[in-house]
Amino acid sequence: MGLRLNELSPGVGAKKTAQRRGRGIGSGLGKTGGRGVKGQKSRSGSSVRSGFEGGQTPLYRRLPKFGFTSKMAMTTAEVRLSELNQIEGDVVSIETLKAANLIRRDMKRARVMLSGEVTKAYTFKGIKVTKGAKQAIEAAGGSIEE
């Protein structure tokens, strides 16, 4: 016997029929179509936006503003030591990090963090390095140029 393509069909209950609202009392969704009676949310067109509290000052305006996002943080990328193995060559700069797709194209600065191992001696040019990463780089025979 076997399975035939022309005999395939979805499982029982897999396909639900769409609810046709406003199509008679017997459907259970006739007349008001599940919207209730009167009020702003029963009207056609639009409803109240999310977070609207009926004219009362909403929560996001009752609470004070705090903090800020540093512009420098938005243009500085963090790179792990373990990710440096993807770089071809032994010089690490912003350009080589972008070429290896380790940082985004819009990043202007980079900082190397101590996470993982350095496999070969790299020369870092124009990149900030954390204290722990600096020790690991120098232990592997690498150097850091400001």
UniProtKB/Swiss-Prot annotation:
Database matches in Pfam families: Ribosomal_L27A (PF00828)
Function, as annotated: Binds to the 23S rRNA.
GO CC annotations on file: cytosolic large ribosomal subunit
Composition bias type Gly residues, residue spans: 24-37
GO BP, sorted A to Z: translation
Taxonomic source organism: Psychrobacter arcticus (strain DSM 17307 / VKM B-2377 / 273-4)
Protein name listed in UniProt: Large ribosomal subunit protein uL15
Gene that this polypeptide is encoded by: rplO
Location of the region described as Disordered in the Swiss-Prot/TrEMBL record: 1-56
Keyword terms, alphabetized: Ribonucleoprotein, Ribosomal protein, RNA-binding, rRNA-binding
